[in-house]
Amino acid sequence: MKVKETWTVASCVIEMRKQAENVTRVHSIYVTDDDDKLKGRLSLKDLLTASTKTHISDVYISKVDYVSVDTKDEEVAKIMQKYDLEAIPVVDQKGVLVGRITIDDIVDFIKEEAEKDYQLAAGISQDVEADDNIYELTKARLPWLVLGLFGGLGSVYILQGFDEALSSYPILFFFTPLIAAMAGNVGVQSSAIIVQGLANDVVKGSMFHRLIKEVGLALINGSILGLLVVLFGAFVGQDFIVSITIALSMLSVIIIASLIGTFVPIILDRKGIDPAIATGPFITTSNDIFGIILFFYIAKLILGF
């Protein structure tokens, strides 16, 4: 609802009754001047308790959150979420009140964005529905599957370059899927948390602070998992030096995968690219490749083949 600051409470109530016939729910009462420029908002309690002869200019609240017609949907959603608003007024470039956006409108937008981000994280490159035709579904899914295919072929090619290592220590071959899986899982975890933080506008501070935090977290997780690998090796009678090699490789891979999963979404966001694309096959495939390379180079340094 919209009222003029020059009106009295009595005339305001009369006008509001007229406007109420055209709305299903009253979220807020906005106050404008004679040129329809937004001046503030009016509390229903203040309206009901004020004298009927009191002017609206004496009781309205001048502090009001608003957005312009050029404000992006994502920014509107963040503002309404931050201040817990049921509705927010919309003004044009001159400050004239042109409408409002309600929480119902934003909920629909958030739902659509969540569905899109989920599809991107799952490796679906465009918005599709389950009942779309085969052509549309194929076009949406195939690009990331092709990326995964080339990533897998790259891993095979890399493994071929370490024939000597696999001949000398065939046990390394059996731990390769474990290293690749841990790299992919850690990368997806890190990227998912960062993407969520970017969406909620809570990822703040310097890149250096984020770097120190992620390295510290990766060191803790990697050390615990590496220790479990060593204990497993001791339990099954595996060569201790091989267990240490695998444990150190896993620690290194977890650190690198965590950094990739953290900073790729941040960099994409700063470049104006949707960071959600970094949470799925892209992170998994890249971390698989880096993980395998790192695994065998560390094994080469320790085992000396």
Task: Please provide the spans of the model-predicted regions.
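Active-site His/Glu-centered metal-binding helix of metallohydrolases
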Residues: I289-F290
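Cytosolic regulatory modules rich in charged/polar residues
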Residues: M1-F174
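Alpha-helical transmembrane segments and their membrane-interface boundaries
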Residues: T6, E113-L251, I255-L259, F263-I277, ...
